[in-house]
């Protein structure tokens, strides 16, 4: 990412570079996981995508980061004068410890500010979610997907797909 940011900082038409490069991908859905920074790479990605999903860990930094991302996306879109089509599809609560007071407080704060964007499916912290990266596997590969973590992410993916279809049909998701 650092090398890409450095290269992009010296490139003309840098906001459309990723769009040009990625337009040849023949898939209906492409997931791009970016670092929570606001460099050239993030701006390029925002120019390419239709939707942004904001993952939020239920702690102070997660809530603060969500607020910053929401503000940044709005400000970037405004600065691009209609050229950026990205919109926030939703906010996904991840790695939550739902019985803790802090997680409950953060969830309440998210509901208060962005209730219409919160996904209903919450990803609770689990051993499998912690262990999968250590074995260089995603949650669906780890233990052949037979984990609570994989089931939670599967339900979240279904909710995301339902919301995308609803948005494309011009209506709110009732999922």
Predicted regions and their residues:
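C-terminal lobe/tail of nucleotide-utilizing enzymes
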Residues: 78-175
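Conserved NTP-handling cores and scaffolds of large molecular machines
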Residues: 16-17, 73, 77, 164
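Flexible, glycine- and charge-enriched loops at secondary-structure boundaries
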Residues: 8-12, 59-62, 146
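Conserved catalytic-core segment of NTP-binding enzymes
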Residues: 24-120
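Cytosolic-facing regulatory segments adjacent to core modules
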Residues: 1-38
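Charged catalytic carboxylate motif
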Residues: 17, 68, 152-155
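Short, flexible helix/strand-to-coil boundary loops that buttress conserved ligand/catalytic motifs
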Residues: 5-6, 42, 133
